[in-house]
């Protein structure tokens, strides 16, 4: 019989080859989120299937973290060893028993050296069985964890934590590429006192310290370490996060113990965390120059109204409909961290925070934007492409840099060197060096050849800003007095490249045509635009009237799905009468929850008796227009028109949303009806021929089915 292997490729432990690893052998870093996630997912599966000691998810996470601490410590010691050929501590021995003994001996020494990392110091061994310890060491020994320590620890935590009840806690750890650009943008220096009140595994703190250390000369490096001891703080509610973050800073030779366990928001619980008050207590309010954080976010992650009232969080005084209110309401944690940051910051202090984009445009969060306008000036908005967090969530986020407004006459800290008074810097750069699979994204040539250059246009924009050079994907815009009716927090809205391309096209290709927005045409009565009828629930779909969803609008056609049909009575309820109100040749496009928003589909004769989901727009030319629906469809189908939709389609949490921003789309308008018909004639002929063929097909089908 052949030797059996599990998914990780582990062979029976007595067959594992034994050899010494040195620091010279540490040459295999885990450079991508995907590789890290796969490694730890496979390790978790192996532990669940084979380990006899650790049966609880929390125990597995804790013990795996302890193994990672030992590995990282071994890597650090190896890099500092005088003899690069000196064997590393973290490697397999000839047998599982010997490997486990060695690891547990090293763990006991590690606990004695860093006792403040551990809440419970009574257990001085790794609670995996010998074979599991042997297998973990075997798989990790040849990998350089320290080269990507922040993301490695974050990924391990994410994978192991997702296996238990904490899966929905909204802890989406920040990828290193976001952290790097964010820390650069914050321009933190040794004058600043910094805190991350939701520090996770310490990515922002580690990058801040590392950045200052890299800029320091030999003599200054000791001063930077002293600065970190006195000015770099972190808080997290999860004890394992705190342990990992502290260990990360120790690995950077910071030695800082300023990362503490505690609840940053619920003040009534602060007495339960003895080390928290010196970091977050009332006497620390107004003492920090920088708050830098990626707080947990999610619609279900809220602080209760009673807790908000006790802490007097004014940001929690709002209605569920999106308006300010005197009463306190349950509020998402990520938003409440805004007020915690405001309290911690001195006048003119800087806040750098990752937040979902939906807070900055949805009508449900008007109260939030009004609160921000009263308390902060928005200095910068840094686009975070969807791919960055796609491995764990699909919410669209951005990194926001804000400055706490000072009271009149009070002293205030100076602006960052790149900031312009009264203006906000926005980058809508489309890439951040991470693809949709979590792998490193490389630039590809026009010929389709992948280069070795990382495609991180966000970092390029930040670098250009700091170097005072130009960028085609960023700009300064005037900061509005209020964010309530502004899209300042949505970077892509300020990408007007598609608008400029359209204007050039009209000038060079459509002589005599003018450019007008859909909103302007609608207001003038030249076109009509309405939403679809509504969305019948699944249990009502049992009739013979087609119900058209956004997924049924494809390739310019309205397609009827035979599995989505409703009865006539249901249809009339959604039509609000006996007629659908639709007419042949109407133009239909998705308006929500579709990647094809803006793509025109034409309603053919005979398709009028249908119920369209409310997530569609239905457009028609009126008698006032110098064009018909065929021209309207042709105009909407132009590439230079379709590209404009990407600017106005926002992400409502994790779904595409158009709102009324369709009104900003520009289309060409002919000077005469004849001119319009001449350019769109091929469009007219195409759809008329399809309609004729469809009518013949349906007639033949009907006769054969009698």
Q: Which ranges hold each PLM region?
A:
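Flexible, glycine-/basic-rich loop-and-beta segments that form/coincide
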Residues: 5-28, 391-514
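Long recognition/docking surfaces used for binding and targeting
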Residues: 67-162
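Conserved S-adenosyl-L-methionine
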Residues: 171-293, 298-299, 309, 355-358, ...
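Conserved Class I SAM-dependent methyltransferase catalytic core
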Residues: 323-388, 394-402
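A short glycine-rich beta-alpha junction/loop motif
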Residues: 400, 609-617, 649-675
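Non-catalytic DNA-recognition/assembly elements of restriction-modification systems
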Residues: 461-537, 671-706
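Sequence-specific dsDNA recognition surfaces
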Residues: 519-536, 553-584
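A short beta-sheet element
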Residues: 578-579, 588-636
